[in-house]
Amino acid sequence: MNHALSAVSLIVFTVGMLPATGQVNPYKEGTPGVTGYRSEVMAEVMVQEDKFMRLAEAIPPEKYTWRPAADVRSFAEVFLHVSAANYNLYEMIGTPAPSGLDLKNIEKSTTDKAKIIATLKDSFAHAKQAIKAMPDADLEKSMDWFGGKNTQRGALLFIVRHGAEHLGQSIAYSRMAGVVPPWTVDAQKKKAEKKAESKE
């Protein structure tokens, strides 16, 4: 009985992780312009970008200042924190941020939905360009990293992990605020359509 439940749980978890209809699927469509490990990183960044952008669009403007507790980031601050990281972290591995950006204060710079979405979009474009610009030969190169040492390969892994952490945070926020993630809505619609077809 326990084995059966475990198998069902694994299937449900796996299906939930698969790209739904309408989502970016770099595992199938590829990552033009990059190869090897950088291609694997690019795929994860592309998926994160797609989900962040769709979630940011789905959150109503009046919810952008919502936060689950007084001492944590709001929706706006999470999205802008991710934007700042897409510049700051890639700058640490060799791709400077565009001049004129106030990265130290960007997180609290605005609560305007349209401006935040534009900032988030631009930051992911920068991140993808930075990955393309990295030579494969530099992946094992040692570098200073938060008071210690890391390789550029390890730094990219850190960046992917950081983005995933805040994507999960944003998904939890959206559920608490009564917003169903768009890809879940898509999956639910597809499931309902299949159920309706099976009854015909």
Model-predicted segments: where are they?
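Positively charged n-region of N-terminal signal peptides that target proteins for export
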Residues: 1-6
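Bacterial N-terminal signal peptides
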Residues: 7-20
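Cleaved targeting-peptide boundary
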Residues: 21-31
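Short, contiguous alpha-helical
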Residues: 24, 42-53, 63-104, 144-200
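Solvent-exposed, charged/polar functional surfaces in cytosolic regulatory/catalytic domains
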Residues: 51-54, 58, 122-130, 169
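Short, flexible helix-adjacent loops and helix caps
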Residues: 60-64, 94, 132, 136-139
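Acidic/histidine-rich alpha-helical segments that form the ligand environment
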Residues: 108-144, 151-163
